[in-house]
Regions:
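Residue signature of alpha-solenoid helical repeat architecture, marking inter-repeat boundaries
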Residues: 68, 105-107, 144-145, 185
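Amphipathic alpha-helical segments of tetratricopeptide repeats
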Residues: 95-99, 132-139, 173-177
Length: 213
């Protein structure tokens, strides 16, 4: 097996595997990801086959991963900074990710995490601004986990700004999108707390009733 063919095989398998993972997560396939992966594979294949360049397949795989996953890697870095309470730096990293020509899915994931960081920074209005505009695309493009997370954070932002009707609507959508999940449990807890805050306790089911279902 020639080095150039190994490069081609590694690149092709990389794209196919990641596309398969997107299908398993019920996300829409990213054409940009495929174009970038196959384009880089074609360039490296040509360089090895006709340019006399020697590249180990493992090094090529690492390079391919870093380039095609650049936005998601930055999002993970931003998430780490956010967990450490360094929200300003986390938001700067998310903004950088959005300027690196992300594909649609990666862009939406960056926006979801940016909205969460604003919420943790006690800036719910900014969370609403970021997530409300992106919500429809998130529901269509990404899997139920991301869509539920978006609705939950949006609901919490509405609750903190006193827009309780909007908050309750978002919490209800979480259960519709991703039932029996951690987000659904959090949303139900937040929904009950919101009803109690607004004095609508008659809509909160009793524990005995809840246990029957």
């Amino acid at each position: 097996m020639t080095p150039s063919f190994l490069i081609f095989l590694v690149g092709l398998l990389y794209v196919v595997i990641f596309w398969s993972l997107s299908l398993l997560r019920r996300e829409r396939l990213s054409n940009q990801f495929a174009y970038e992966g196959l384009g880089l594979t074609g360039i490296m294949f040509s360089a090895v086959r006709w340019g006399g360049v020697g590249v180990h397949p493992i090094y090529f795989l690492v390079l391919l991963y870093l380039i095609t996953m650049r936005v998601r890697l930055l999002v993970e870095l931003g998430n780490m900074l956010s967990k450490w309470g360094r929200y300003h730096q986390a938001l700067a990293v998310y903004r950088l990710a959005l300027h690196l020509f992300p594909d649609r899915s990666s862009r939406l994931i960056a926006l979801i995490n940016m909205g969460a960081a604003y919420l943790e920074q006690a800036k719910p209005e900014r969370t609403i601004e970021v997530l409300e505009n992106a919500k429809a695309q998130i529901v269509r493009q990404l899997g139920p986990k991301y869509a539920a997370g978006c609705c939950y954070n949006l609901g919490m932002a509405y609750r903190r700004t006193g827009r309780y009707a909007h908050a309750l609507r978002q919490f209800s959508e979480v259960d519709d999108i991703y039932p029996l999940s951690g987000y659904a449990r959090l949303a139900e807890k937040a929904r009950k707390a919101t009803l109690e805050e607004t004095g609508m306790t008659m809509f909160v089911p009793k524990e005995e009733d809840a246990e029957r279902f």
